[in-house]
Swiss-Prot record:
The lineage of its organism: Bacteria, Bacillati, Bacillota, Bacilli, Lactobacillales. The gene is hisZ. GO terms for molecular function: catalytic activity, acting on a protein; histidine-tRNA ligase activity; transferase activity. This is ATP phosphoribosyltransferase regulatory subunit. It comes from Lactococcus lactis subsp. lactis (strain IL1403) (Streptococcus lactis). GO terms for cellular component: cytoplasm. Pathway: Amino-acid biosynthesis; L-histidine biosynthesis; L-histidine from 5-phospho-alpha-D-ribose 1-diphosphate: step 1/9.
């Protein structure tokens, strides 16, 4: 009898036995940590009405419908396989809110269509938390502190933690006067030569030119502060001051890098953003931020902030780290 070779779709991801073991160990540690911090574990449904994603707008943009796995129910309504965890938890908070604040944790997969040639998987395992309804200062410090504690539980040796501001980025785009798309691309790629060419082609003020030319500096805080202060722009200055305050308050836990060129990964981020990286990975291992505007779509007004661990990236980084240690 001929043996049939059943292949996985190229976009699918199948964890190895060691990856599953590592995942469950990390889950156990993080469940314990989240429980100690009073975060309740929730399990959103795998499917949501597509309208949950397409009807919500943030900063004039909608979610990328081309990346959604959509299906038609027998009644004719469109439903979508879970695209992310944040929106379902915003919906949950708005529906069952019985207090001024809520703390949720989650463990599971999200599903997004990806192009084959990019080598990305359409299914990604995430572990994360969301905090709703606390005051801005309290919630931001709580989440940042918890994110740093989570990083310590991952088992990765060399990590860095960066913070940025969506408000700072949005103000830069306003000052760029119609060149938002190009500026965003240059900042995402951290293309210094391209950024210098962009600056020369535009009639920016001397102070803004000075800031943009050195915006990728991350190890000279006083120099960055002077460059921002010289712009005399209230939004840029207040955003930087907030990041500096977070850096100073959390530096006893772990050194914090301020990245003024950080670009929001999700359109709904409104203020603080942060990412963590490992020397054993080429993608962020953790990312998060503030997204207050999303709640207004559910007739709620409250501060909202959260983050997620990108477990597929983390598990591969752990394997690479172990391999490097064995070769030393």
């Amino acid at each position: 009898m001929e043996k049939i070779n059943y292949l996985l779709p190229e976009e699918s991801a199948e964890m190895t036995l060691n990856q599953v073991k590592s995942l469950r160990q990390i889950e156990g540690r993080l469940r314990k940590l989240f429980s100690l911090k009073n975060y309740q574990e929730v399990m959103p449904p795998s499917f949501e009405y597509t309208q949950l994603y397409t009807a919500l707008e943030s900063n004039g943009k909608t979610f990328n419908q081309e990346k959604m796995f959509q299906f038609i129910k027998h009644e004719g309504q469109s439903i979508t396989l879970r695209y992310d965890f944040t929106l379902p938890l915003v919906r949950l908070y708005s529906q069952i809110k019985d207090s001024t604040s809520a703390r949720y944790s989650y463990f599971g997969k999200i599903f997004r269509k990806e192009k084959r040639h990019k080598g990305r998987s359409t299914e990604n395992y995430q572990i994360g938390i969301e905090l709703f309804g606390e005051s801005a200062d309290k919630s931001e410090l709580e989440i940042l502190s918890l994110a740093l504690q989570v990083i310590e539980q991952l088992g990765l040796n060399k990590t860095v933690f960066e913070i940025g501001s969506a408000k700072f980025f949005q103000r830069l785009c306003q000052l760029a006067d119609g060149s938002t798309e190009l500026l965003t691309e240059l900042l995402l790629k951290k293309d210094l030569s391209g950024l210098n060419a962009f600056i020369e082609k535009n009639n920016f003020s001397k102070e803004l030119r000075g800031l943009l030319k050195e915006i990728f500096i991350t190890n000279e805080l006083s120099r960055l502060e002077n460059l921002v202060t010289n712009t005399k722009d209230d939004v840029l200055i207040s955003s930087f001051d907030q990041l500096k305050e977070f850096s100073e308050k959390l530096s006893m836990i772990k050194p914090i890098i301020i990245d003024l060129g950080m670009v929001p990964k999700m359109d709904y981020y409104t203020d603080l953003m942060f990412k963590a990286y490992s020397s054993a990975a080429n993608q962020p291992i953790l990312s998060g931020g503030r997204y207050d505007q999303l709640l207004s779509n559910f007739q709620e007004e409250a501060f909202a902030i959260g983050f997620c661990c990108h477990m597929d990236t983390i598990l591969k980084a752990l394997e690479r780290q172990e391999l490097e240690e064995d070769n030393d």
